[in-house]
């Protein structure tokens, strides 16, 4: 039985509203033909974020070379080449939106020799050239385990280096067949050990994991010197995606938060609608970003 089609609990019902910035944000992003993870990944927080004039920019197109079963982003083996004007367009959007903190992410581009890392670098530099005061969070893919490609992005010294483990290792074959749990942990640890970046990761719950497995993964992240963690409810994007196994209660999310804090994470967000880039600017505003 597809549990996602059961009645959702009250805590998962959103009141949709649009503020004064919503239409302006939508018009700006559409006019520049920019991709956002908000729209491409069917994020439940799109209304809230766009209404506040914030968005997470998605680099390298809107089509991914991976087939993760939880993700709403379109898939193909051979996407179109990256738009060479995209870095400048994003920089212009950041300036137009008067952002103080910008989150960049991307699809996986296993079809490109550098995994898209050169495009990442161009985007970071374009943003900083036009917006020298802005802080940048990079939510990166694993670059297929090619260290040189990941290093190219880390060398740009983003204020936050984010890479999501997404789920517990036992679910990787079913949920993330082309990814590797240990490889993701190694990327996070390298960002801290070699480049001294503030590190972040996130995971979804409700896909069939146990509480003990979540606790173990939180421990693995801390052992890999991850500073910030986000935990949110998995929601099935379409009938073709992985079904929801169960709805995690707010009390359980609070327990996960307490567990993470006890392990020493410097900042924790845990709740049904938490996503990796949700309220990301708060981490910077609260001065959690330090080179250590």
Curated annotation (Swiss-Prot):
Pfam families: Radical_SAM. Its EC number is 2.8.1.8. Binds 2 [4Fe-4S] clusters per subunit. One cluster is coordinated with 3 cysteines and an exchangeable S-adenosyl-L-methionine. One of its GO terms (cellular component) is cytoplasm. Pathway: Protein modification; protein lipoylation via endogenous pathway; protein N(6)-(lipoyl)lysine from octanoyl-[acyl-carrier-protein]: step 2/2. InterPro entries: Aldolase_TIM, Elp3/MiaA/NifB-like_rSAM, Lipoyl_synth, rSAM. It is an enzyme of class 2 (transferase). [4Fe-4S] cluster 1 binds at residues 38, 43, 49, 277. It is found in: Cytoplasm. One of its GO terms (molecular function) is metal ion binding. [4Fe-4S] cluster 2 binds at residues 64, 68, 71. Residues 50-266 form the Radical SAM core domain. Belongs to the radical SAM superfamily. Lipoyl synthase family. HAMAP family: Lipoyl_synth. This is Lipoyl synthase. It comes from Chlorobium limicola (strain DSM 245 / NBRC 103803 / 6330). The gene is lipA.
């Amino acid at each position: 039985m597809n549990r996602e089609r059961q009645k959702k609990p009250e805590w998962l019902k959103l009141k949709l509203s649009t503020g004064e910035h919503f239409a302006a944000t939508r018009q700006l992003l559409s006019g520049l033909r920019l991709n956002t993870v908000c729209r491409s990944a069917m994020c439940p927080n799109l209304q809230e974020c766009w209404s506040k004039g914030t968005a997470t920019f998605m680099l390298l197109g809107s089509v991914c070379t991976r087939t993760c079963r939880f993700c709403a982003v379109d898939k193909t083996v051979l996407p179109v080449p990256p738009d060479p004007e995209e870095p400048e367009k994003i920089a212009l959007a950041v300036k137009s939106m008067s952002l103080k903190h910008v989150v960049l992410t991307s699809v996986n581009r296993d079809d490109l020799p550098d995994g898209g890392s050169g495009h990442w670098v161009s985007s970071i530099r374009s943003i900083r050239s036009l917006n020298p005061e802005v802080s940048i969070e990079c939510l990166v893919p694993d670059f297929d385990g090619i260290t040189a490609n990941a290093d190219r992005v880390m060398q740009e010294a983003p204020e936050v280096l984010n890479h999501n483990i997404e789920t517990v290792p036992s679910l990787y074959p079913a949920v993330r067949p082309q990814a590797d749990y240990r490889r993701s942990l190694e990327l996070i640890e390298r960002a801290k050990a070699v480049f001294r970046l503030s590190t972040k990761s996130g995971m979804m719950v409700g896909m069939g994991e146990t509480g003990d497995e979540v606790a173990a993964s939180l421990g693995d992240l801390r052992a890999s010197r991850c500073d910030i963690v986000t935990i949110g409810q998995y929601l099935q994007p379409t009938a073709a995606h992985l079904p929801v196994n169960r709805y995690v209660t707010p009390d359980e999310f609070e327990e996960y938060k307490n567990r993470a804090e006890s392990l020493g994470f410097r900042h924790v967000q845990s709740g049904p609608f938490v996503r990796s880039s949700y309220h990301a600017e708060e981490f910077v505003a609260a001065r959690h970003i330090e080179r250590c």
